Every structure is written in C-alpha cells, then in structure tokens.
Amino acid sequence: MRKIIIPIITILLIALDQLSKLWIVKHIELNQIKEFIPNIVSLTYLRNYGAAFSILQNQQWLFTLITIFVVCVAIIYLMKHINGSYWLLISLTLIISGGLGNFIDRLRLGYVVDMVHLDFINFAIFNVADSYLTIGIICLMIALWKEESNGNHN
C-alpha cells in the first residue's frame, strides 16, 4: 500500500507547490508585496536564481546537479526502507517533493518562484517547496534520532 500512497502524495505535494507558484505569477506583479495575514505573512513574487532562501545566486548548473543527486539518493533510500518508520517516509517524501518542485521551476523558467514573506521576522522569502525541504530535513533528523535511540542501526 505504501508503494502506491507515497507516489500519490508526492505528486499532490508537487502539484500544490506548482499551483501556488502559478497563482502568484498570475496575480502578483514581480517584486510587489501584498498583505495576506496582517503583520504575519505577506505574499510577493520574486525570481530566485539561487538556492533555498536565495543563497548562491546564478549557479543553476550546480543546483541542477545537487538536486538530481539528492532526489535520486532520497528515492533509492525510500525504496529500500519503504517499510520504515512514518517519520522516515514523511521526511523523504517531503524532501523529494520539495526538491522536484524547485527543480521543475529551474528547468521550466530558469529560476525558482518565491512568494512567502514573514512580516514578523527578518527572514528570507521562500516558497512551498522550500517549506517541504525544511520540514523534511527536520523530520529526517527526528527519524534518525528515534532510530538511534531505539538501537535500530539499519
């Protein structure tokens, strides 16, 4: 059952990321900021030619190689551990979805669409795929910690 559910969830997560970016591009002009939840979140449309949180600008070839490598490793690890813990499956699904969501932008547009601006903190503008990656890495750390504390060293 997991072999069916996980690809479906991955496709749905990528679709949500791509639809959110499409909506932003259609409804907000480049570099314009629109208040979404007052004093908490604004939406904007930025073109990010770098990595997550706009680091390493204009290094598309590097991000393409890194993304292909990370996504392939995550897929292989997921397939080998398909019966693993839910934390592990969630983390890898989020990492794969986030990596592919931004990869699609890079291939299609030459940049990644970023849109979420946190008004209450000075933080980089990011997108849904970046959120998947961040949450996925946190879940992976939890999965590895739980595995370590249970003495399960596969």
Curated annotation (Swiss-Prot):
Its EC number is 3.4.23.36. This protein specifically catalyzes the removal of signal peptides from prolipoproteins. Disulfide bonds: none annotated. One of its GO terms (molecular function) is aspartic-type endopeptidase activity. GO terms for biological process: proteolysis. HAMAP family: LspA. The chain crosses the membrane at residues 4-24, 62-82, 84-104, 125-145. The active site is at 114, 130. Keywords: Aspartyl protease, Cell membrane, Hydrolase, Membrane, Protease, Transmembrane, Transmembrane helix. It is a multi-pass membrane protein. Pathway: Protein modification; lipoprotein biosynthesis (signal peptide cleavage). The gene is lspA. This is Lipoprotein signal peptidase.
